[in-house]
């Protein structure tokens, strides 16, 4: 079915009919996804208008009028007066349509020297910078809570497991310190990824530049980018690749979230009974009155699947030659879904970590005699017996290895750096304090 073109179709050619089904397929849910990026798009349009005025393509009065209308559009979008919906093909066309509606010919100048390609590149780049800043902050917060608990509970004995089998005497402090260091690593990765993508693609147009002396250094500074993304072809190559890098940084954190949630899921079972969760982190059963289910940590555990799925979707989209291809439109939905689920789950973790309670008696009772066998083997090796012989001796006497030993003496003896008697918390704290917190301009929302 052919229908008259929407006024917001920037690419429409006179005399060419628009098939409604094809247009629906092309647009998909693009305009709805652009609600995530719309205010960033307006911010970039402001910088672009300033750059046009600096090379004489807008008069000072025209610039003032455009900036005023862009601010009005921002205000109306925030308060719900302006609705970005399917009457527009996408957020870019909505901005140009509004400026044209309010300013006539002046509004029609806003797209001079830019393409929707670099327009969405810069909007998503600003969006990703903010999300990576949030991710870095969350990683730092999680590490901070874990460090606090490591210091408070470094002498609390608990079983250490390999293969989900009891292995050696460990401590709650060591468990906490392990997560602290891992989330410090995650914060570093988020900051490094922020630095990678902190470059300005605006002004690269459709991927080959334009025959205008665009003031790209101005837009770089105005938008708070650390540097210019120089080559237009590289700018197009970075679409999807930078989104993939951001999701990998997020996935590093949600992978650890999945594993700590696994630990907590096990530790809350009656078979382990190592911890007690705050009541608001569990729900009841619809049929079994006796049940309290750890649904929150189970859904935390499941979050990484959503992030990994988003990453895989973008990776598959990138099976492309150089230059822009419409396939890349689908990368927007992937990053929105991935970051929405990932950040929401990570936001719940600091409070949970600060409030869960260990059950010391149960922890101690789970330490069986065989868990001292490694200590016995190493002590024999220190006394001069070759370790492999000491190992065999300790294996034969594992059932009685606890004689003369306590969990505390085992922990005290583990003096290798990072082990229970020397958690190196000051080293971890120093590393935490030197984390580079990425900065972004205030979120335009």
Curated annotation (Swiss-Prot):
One Gene Ontology CC term in the entry: cytosol
Catalytic activity: 2-(N(omega)-L-arginino)succinate = fumarate + L-arginine
Subcellular localization: Cytoplasm
SUPFAM superfamilies xref list: L-aspartase-like
Keywords recorded for this protein, A-Z: Amino-acid biosynthesis, Arginine biosynthesis, Cytoplasm, Lyase
Pathway: Amino-acid biosynthesis; L-arginine biosynthesis; L-arginine from L-ornithine and carbamoyl phosphate: step 3/3
GO biological process: one example: L-arginine biosynthetic process
Cross-referenced InterPro entries: Argininosuccinate_lyase, Fumarase/histidase_N, Fumarate_lyase_CS, Fumarate_lyase_fam, Fumarate_lyase_N, L-Aspartase-like
Stored Pfam families: Lyase_1 (PF00206)
Enzyme class at the top of the EC tree: lyase
A GO molecular-function annotation: argininosuccinate lyase activity
EC number: 4.3.2.1
Highest taxon above the source species: Bacteria
Similarity-based family: Belongs to the lyase 1 family. Argininosuccinate lyase subfamily.
PANTHER family in the cross-refs: ARGININOSUCCINATE LYASE
Name by which UniProt lists this protein: Argininosuccinate lyase
Species classification: Bacteria, Pseudomonadati, Pseudomonadota, Gammaproteobacteria, Lysobacterales
Gene responsible for this protein: argH
